[in-house]
């Protein structure tokens, strides 16, 4: 999980960090 980012994309899929997802969707591309 990365602070301030709700969605984290890996090689094959994206995961959601529920603790930081609110208001921070799609900010992390790596």
UniProtKB/Swiss-Prot annotation:
Alphabetical keyword list: Antibiotic, Antimicrobial, Bacteriocin, Disulfide bond, Secreted
Keyword Oxidoreductase: no
Activity-pH dependence: Stable below pH 6.
Temperature dependence: Stable below 60 degrees Celsius. Activity decreases sharply at temperatures above 60 degrees Celsius.
InterPro entries on file: Bacteriocin_IIa_dom_sf
Family, similarity comment: Belongs to the bacteriocin class IIA/YGNGV family.
Recorded GO CC terms: extracellular region
Organism this protein belongs to: Latilactobacillus curvatus
Protein's name according to its UniProt entry: Bacteriocin curvaticin
GO BP term, pick one: killing of cells of another organism
Disulfide bonds: 9-14
Gene3D superfamilies: 1.20.5.130
Subcellular locations according to the entry: Secreted
Physiological role: Has antibacterial activity against the Gram-positive bacterium L.monocytogenes.
